[in-house]
């Protein structure tokens, strides 16, 4: 019989203060690393797409859903139009009007209860950024958006509610 002990010292006592704007910038950097590794140009960080992405992340968090579509059925393209943003990239007979990735992460990687009190193993900003990009790159549809050669710009939107981190990435 083996007993596994986890000293409480392994678990950080304080919840980290994650700056959403700094996290957005770091995710953008890591996305560009993936594109360059694939022989593609880095994406321009678009403030307009960022505002649209932030709005969607905030909406998902505040209304407790996780989807590309709002509870009323509003699509990513509808959000672009509502914000007065137009993305129309013509390649031959095909027209691209944008793309979107979403991800829900956590501020912690594990929790241990000691005498009924939770002790969290908090994630750093870097861990959240890397696990988000890794999650997208390991999903065929999300990877396809990230490595789509016709996309030239992206906006990342992060919203933190409780211990959850909502992340939206919009492309054009």
Predicted features and spans:
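Conserved beta-strand positions that form and line the central face of beta-propeller blades
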Residues: 42, 101, 170
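A well-ordered secondary-structure block
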Residues: 76-165
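Short, well-ordered surface patches within globular domains
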Residues: 13-15, 19-86, 143, 149-155, ...
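Bacterial N-terminal signal peptides
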Residues: 1-7
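Low-complexity, Gly/Ser/Thr/Pro-rich intrinsically disordered linker/tail segments
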Residues: 165-168, 172
């Amino acid at each position: 019989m083996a007993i596994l002990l986890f000293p409480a010292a392994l678990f950080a006592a304080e919840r980290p203060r994650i700056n959403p704007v700094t996290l957005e910038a770091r995710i953008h950097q890591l996305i560009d690393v993936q594109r360059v590794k694939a022989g593609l140009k880095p994406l321009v960080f678009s403030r307009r797409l960022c505002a649209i992405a932030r709005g969607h992340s905030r909406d998902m968090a505040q209304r407790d859903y996780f989807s590309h579509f709002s509870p009323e059925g509003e699509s990513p393209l509808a959000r672009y139009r509502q914000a007065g943003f137009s993305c129309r990239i013509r390649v031959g007979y095909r027209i691209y009007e944008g793309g979107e990735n979403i991800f829900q992460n956590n501020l912690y990687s594990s929790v241990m209860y000691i005498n009924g009190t939770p002790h969290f193993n908090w994630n750093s900003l870097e861990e959240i950024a890397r696990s988000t990009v890794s999650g997208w790159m390991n999903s065929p549809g999300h990877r396809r958006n990230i490595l789509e050669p016709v996309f030239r710009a992206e906006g990342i939107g992060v919203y933190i509610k409780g211990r959850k981190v909502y992340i939206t990435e919009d492309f054009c």
